[in-house]
Structure formats: structure tokens, C-alpha cells
Curated annotation (Swiss-Prot):
It holds the Pfam family Keratin_assoc. Belongs to the KRTCAP2 family. This is Dolichyl-diphosphooligosaccharide--protein glycosyltransferase subunit KCP2. GO terms for cellular component: oligosaccharyltransferase complex. It comes from Canis lupus familiaris (Dog). Component of STT3A-containing oligosaccharyl transferase (OST-A) complex. STT3A-containing complex assembly occurs through the formation of 3 subcomplexes. Subcomplex 1 contains RPN1 and TMEM258, subcomplex 2 contains the STT3A-specific subunits STT3A, DC2/OSTC, and KCP2 as well as the core subunit OST4, and subcomplex 3 contains RPN2, DAD1, and OST48. The OST-A complex can form stable complexes with the Sec61 complex or with both the Sec61 and TRAP complexes. Interacts with PSEN1 and NCSTN; indicative for an association with the gamma-secretase complex.
Amino acid sequence: MAVGTGTSLALSSLLSLLLFAGMQMYSRQLASTEWLTIQGGLLGSGLFVFSLTAFNNLENLVFGKGFQAKIFPEILLCLLLALFASGLIHRVCVTTCFIFSMVGLYYINKISSTLYQAATPVLTPAKVTGKGKKRN
């Protein structure tokens, strides 16, 4: 069930903060093995998604409904935040965070385009009826 913009802003901001704090609290454990560094990148991409949601909800509250996130500054700022948080854990976490974030961003864009883009009607050329050049 969907919630309002203000509630979504509060929830995504809280989840971003908790995820960042959890990543910092368990940074030694996340950097200890190969699989946990991949998990650290996955957590970083979750931080990217939640911070992007919070940032876009804030813009919708300030600028009005229908304001969409663009690549610069919204997506790049949230991506740099997530990459920085992952970099505090391990350098491999940065790479996996980037890969997981790009996959997540692709699916977010795909879902939002099917939900929010208006269908454009397909224009077919009409057959011209009229006097044409006669051939012998």
C-alpha cells in the first residue's frame, strides 16, 4: 500500500540513516570476508535507493507534485553518498555498490516509466485523396 509523500520522506530518511549507521557499526565484519564485502556493496545500493527516494520526496514537497529526479544533481549526489559510505567499509564495496546501484536504478526507471509516463498515441499517415497526376 502506498503512503503519502511526507510519510515516504520520513520513512526513507529514517531507513537511510539506520542503514548508514548499521554499515558503520559493522564495518569490520563487512570487510572481513569476500562475501561480506559484496553484501556491503548491496547495503550501499540500498542506501542509494533510500536516499534517492528521500531526496525526490523532499523535492516533491518543496517544488510540487510531478517534479522528477534528474541525473544531475539528484542521482549523482545520492550515488556519491552511497559510494562514500561503501568506501568507508572496503574498496571492493564501492565497486559492488556501483554495480548494484546501476541495476537498481535501471529497474526503478523501468517501473516508473510504465507507471507514470503518459501513453503517446501512434500517428498513422492518412491516405491522401484528391486529384493526382494522370499518367498515360
